[in-house]
A protein has these predicted regions:
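Conserved acidic functional residues
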Residues: 35, 106, 283-284
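Flexible "cap/lid" subdomain of the alpha/beta-hydrolase fold that forms the substrate-access gate
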Residues: 2-5, 16-17, 29, 65-99, ...
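Conserved HGGG/HGGXW glycine-rich cap/lid loop of the alpha/beta-hydrolase fold
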Residues: 20-70
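Short acidic-hydrophobic surface loop/beta-edge motif
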Residues: 6-12
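A short loop-to-beta-strand scaffold at the N-terminal edge of the catalytic core in hydrolase folds
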Residues: 12-21
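Hydrophobic residues on the short alpha-helix immediately C-terminal to a glycine-rich phosphate/catalytic loop
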Residues: 46, 115, 292-296
Length: 300
């Protein structure tokens, strides 16, 4: 049986969050969180499979993407990690979800990790791509080897106004290039890319993205509303909730870590699952990503 998705918008803190919901509202709750530069279309097959398995699956557009909008024009268009965490927490409250499994990659994985880290009682489990997806901003000035720095060109590009103008003018070219670079063995179709590309036309996309890639290096001030949360993150606490890590083996931004390395950040690591995928494993290998979530559900 395939369960059709319903679309909705809910007031959640400073946002009106656009989302799709799959399955039965009385099912076991899951929130799937996309990364940059992707959107909810990357979870279509995962969400359908989980709904068929009895889950209540919520897939939101992050701030700056798709039909999600800021409630007030006065709210800072922040892309900082604490803002993403609060967005997820507010969404869980707004939809009345009880201890969902939260799963994500890139920006979405960061939001999921942070809520699991700072408010562990609010979630029942975590699926995180590439592990401890938490920025250590005080240490961001420490250089990496040149080969690693080269891969981060897309971040440094946005550190000046030429990059901001470039993202605004060439957002589809920029994002398509990142899809190709980060997942070299994923031969996505033009239809797959064009299904997601409209999300980058959100009026706040450029501001949120640029702020994200400046704030993480200490090059832009954060929203004062999140100062307390950012201070809590600086301590780099361990994550104690049941966790499955999905480590992609074809990702070009990072390499898989050993279980021992991951366990320095996760005290309840249920499974370390390596997957033949690049940066977007939910869309590239949906069966593996679905299985990671189901592993947490069946052990609960």
């Amino acid at each position: 049986m395939t369960v059709m998705a319903e679309s909705g918008v809910v007031r959640a803190g400073v946002l009106d969050v656009a989302f799709e919901r799959h399955g039965n509202a009385n099912g076991w709750p899951v929130v799937l969180l996309h990364g940059f530069p992707y959107d909810i279309r990357g979870y279509d097959r995962v969400a359908a499979a989980l709904a068929d398995a009895g889950a209540d699956v919520v897939v939101p557009y992050l701030r700056g993407y798709g039909a999600t909008r800021f409630v007030s024009s006065d709210t800072m268009r922040s892309g900082q990690q604490a803002a993403l965490a609060h967005d997820l927490l507010e969404l869980i409250d707004a939809l009345g979800l009880t201890a969902p499994i939260v799963a994500g990659y890139d920006w979405g994985g960061r939001a999921a990790c942070l809520v699991a880290m700072l408010w562990p009682e609010r979630v029942s489990g975590l699926v995180s791509v590439s592990g401890y997806n938490v920025q250590n901003i005080p240490a961001s000035g420490q250089p990496a080897p040149p080969e690693d720095e080269r891969r981060l060109w897309y971040q440094y590009y946005l550190h000046n106004e030429r990059g901001r103008a470039g993202l605004a003018a060439y957002r589809e070219d920029y994002t398509r290039l990142l899809w190709r670079e980060w997942s070299p063995n994923w031969h996505f179709t033009e239809a797959e890319f064009t299904a997601t590309a409209p999300s980058f036309s959100n009026p706040d996309f450029v501001d949120v993205v640029v702020h994200s890639y400046r704030h993480r290096y200490g090059l832009a001030a954060g929203d004062p509303a999140y100062d307390q949360t950012e201070r809590a993150i600086e301590a780099q606490p361990v994550i104690t909730v049941p966790t499955v890590i999905v480590d992609p083996t074809e990702e070009t931004l990072s390499s898989p870590d050993s279980r021992a390395e991951h366990e320095t950040h996760f005290t309840n690591l249920v499974e370390l699952r390596t997957v033949a995928a690049g940066h977007n494993p939910a869309q590239e290998q949906p069966a593996d990503f679905t299985a990671a979530i189901q592993r947490l559900h069946t052990q609960a």
